[in-house]
């Protein structure tokens, strides 16, 4: 399972970094609509967090990214035996590391996927593949914890009860 997680994480990270490289050198000054005004490809450099929040505070965002990656490692260790949780967390890690890489080496995050839903300012944003990994991984992890974690916990308790009953009978 560990090898699978490493492979998944590396492949996803490579896809993210290649897509950012291609966007940076091929899309400057362009806006390519894909689905009307709702979805398109455009290149932007975001020196903040989501929606440009904390723009210009690269050092703070790097520190926050380091803390998030450490927390992610702790969560991964804690849930390492929960079925599929390590895969979901590998997806999150690929997203976190992709954006962390950008902040370290460029001072900003390279975004290229424009999403617009109506005229609402909170739904008009540009993101990247790493951001999508973050959302997918977090949602998958939440589903796994909600639906599989209790089963694993119960089976672990059953195994412990069985071993304790064997100790009593021996």
Model-predicted segments: where are they?
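Alpha-helical transmembrane bundles and membrane-interface segments of multipass inner-membrane proteins
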Residues: 1-170
């Amino acid at each position: 399972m560990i090898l699978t997680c490493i492979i998944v994480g590396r492949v996803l990270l490579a896809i993210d970094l290649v897509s950012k490289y291609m966007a940076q050198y091929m899309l400057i000054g362009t806006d390519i609509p894909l689905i009307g005004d709702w979805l398109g490809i455009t290149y932007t450099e975001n020196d903040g967090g989501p929606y440009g929040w904390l723009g210009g505070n690269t050092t703070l965002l790097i520190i926050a990214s380091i803390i998030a990656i450490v927390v992610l490692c702790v969560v991964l260790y804690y849930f390492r035996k929960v079925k599929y949780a390590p895969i979901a967390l590998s997806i999150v890690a690929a997203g976190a590391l992709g954006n962390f890489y950008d902040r370290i080496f460029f001072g900003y995050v390279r975004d290229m996927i424009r999403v617009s839903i109506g005229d609402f300012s909170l739904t008009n944003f540009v993101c990247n593949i790493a951001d999508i990994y973050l959302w997918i991984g977090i949602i998958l992890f939440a589903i796994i914890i909600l639906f599989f974690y209790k089963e694993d916990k119960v089976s672990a308790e059953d195994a412990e009860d069985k071993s304790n009953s064997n100790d009593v009978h021996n």
